[in-house]
């Protein structure tokens, strides 16, 4: 089957917690690039009225719903971390729906290329939707320091998140481009701008 000509050229953008991938994504947005965040898509598919939320409530019971009918993420997170089989059930339900939601929003792109930002780009298989992978990397201690400064969380929780994500080595081995974000924001912006011009060339836009 031929690929539709209007399908956008897609860059996958990923990085571990505290790496700076959100700051990089925001600068691509500032440069006029259409960005779809997989975390947002994951929230959209479980909004009230969507079929996935009804299936989750039916499977786990009413305790995973808040009084206003929205998903109680903390309650659900506790259930799936305690029972791995339940996590697998949830992933089997949500991953295809999230991929569908992402594809829909990527197809709306009017910019020369589009970006899929996902912390689990590699682990979830979402990289298959992209033509190229950019990894924002940072030394682990810097990841921890940034996350502790940004979030109301403990170092133990940050370490748990790091363990759940792909290792730095695995992410980098899958990357086409890597930015080691261990300097200031101005430097990160300059790297994003350099890559932006490169991606314009690759995608057939103006450089």
Swiss-Prot record:
Domain of life according to the entry: Bacteria
BP terms from Gene Ontology: coenzyme A biosynthetic process
Transmembrane segments: none
Residues annotated to bind ATP: 18-23
Biological role stated in the UniProt entry: Catalyzes the phosphorylation of the 3'-hydroxyl group of dephosphocoenzyme A to form coenzyme A.
Pathway per the UniProt entry: Cofactor biosynthesis; coenzyme A biosynthesis; CoA from (R)-pantothenate: step 5/5
Catalytic activity: 3'-dephospho-CoA + ATP = ADP + CoA + H(+)
Pfam families on file: CoaE
Gene that encodes the chain: coaE
EC number(s) recorded for this UniProt protein: 2.7.1.24
A GO CC annotation given for this chain: cytoplasm
GO molecular function: ATP binding; dephospho-CoA kinase activity
Disulfide topology: none
Record protein name field: Dephospho-CoA kinase
Keywords: ATP-binding, Coenzyme A biosynthesis, Cytoplasm, Kinase, Nucleotide-binding, Transferase
InterPro entries for this protein: Depp_CoAkinase, P-loop_NTPase
Organism: Pseudomonas fluorescens (strain Pf0-1)
Main location: cytoplasm
């Amino acid at each position: 089957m031929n690929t539709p000509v209007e399908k956008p050229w897609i860059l996958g953008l990923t990085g571990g917690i505290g790496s700076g991938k959100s700051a990089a994504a925001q600068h691509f947005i500032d440069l006029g690039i259409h960005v779809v965040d997989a975390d947002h898509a994951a929230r959209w598919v479980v909004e009230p009225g969507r079929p996935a939320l009804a299936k989750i409530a039916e499977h786990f019971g009413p305790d995973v719903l808040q009084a206003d009918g929205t998903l109680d993420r903390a309650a659900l997170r506790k259930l799936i971390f305690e029972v791995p089989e339940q996590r697998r059930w949830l992933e089997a339900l949500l991953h295809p729906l999230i991929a569908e939601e992402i594809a829909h929003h990527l197809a709306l792109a009017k910019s020369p290329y589009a970006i899929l930002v996902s912390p689990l780009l590699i682990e979830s298989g979402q990289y298959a939707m992209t033509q190229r992978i950019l990894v924002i990397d940072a030394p682990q201690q810097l990841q921890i320091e940034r996350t502790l400064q940004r979030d109301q969380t403990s170092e133990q929780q940050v370490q748990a998140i790091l363990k759940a994500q792909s290792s730095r080595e695995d992410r980098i081995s899958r990357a086409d481009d890597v930015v080691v974000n261990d300097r200031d924001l101005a430097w990160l912006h300059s790297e994003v701008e350099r890559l932006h011009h490169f991606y314009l060339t690759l995608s057939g836009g103006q450089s």
